[in-house]
Amino acid sequence: MALFTEENIFIVTGASSGIGKTVALKLVEEGAKVVSIARNLERLQSVKAECVKPECFLCENADLTEHLSDMSGYLKSLKEKYGKFSGIAYCAGQILLKPASATEYEESVNLFNINYFAPVMMIKTFMDKRICTGGGASAVAVASAEAFLREKGLCIYSGTKAALQASLATIAKEVAPRGMRVNTVSPSDIKTPMTMNEDMISIRQGREETYPLGFGEPGDVSELVVFLLSNKSKWLTGHDYIADCATF
């Protein structure tokens, strides 16, 4: 039996690739409608073509950092277009691989904007009953195990993910009395376009052999994200769930 119906409308960011793509496709497979957001519209439309029910995969082309100062206005415009939302999965993100000594302020701010401020502003705004369905609404953000693994060269990236975990756990406590839930999922190494590019070779070298089950696939994470968005996890909120294979 499907987890959702077409009355359940979800927002998924970063839906054109990686974990966001598999989350969006899985939600549609489980019966929901998905407003899929990404900066690359061409890639997003190609994902729609893969969908089992393309009519339930709704494409929105946006750079979320451009809406930081008025996230409320942006989400209200989506609600007016599609209706109230049952949940949101924030899967958009970027990585910055540099030693701390070479890291510049501006690039650090840019990374915090997409990895921290955008999800925090989006999720705290989403929890407005004028935008979400109220009690039972669920938000999940993809963080990272790097928040506590603290690999060399990932100073700012690790900081964005640790901050995200902490802030969303706080928001979860604030919205729990209204029956709303907020969680994060922190994967270790997953084979996505972001983590498997040439810039990440120095991190990956010799690392996969330390993974008892090898590097994960995006689908290994999306199953957990979809579970946390569903009513099957109705008692779970305010926590970070590690997606890993006994690596640490």
Where in the sequence are the language-model features?
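Active-site helix of classical SDR
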Residues: 123, 160
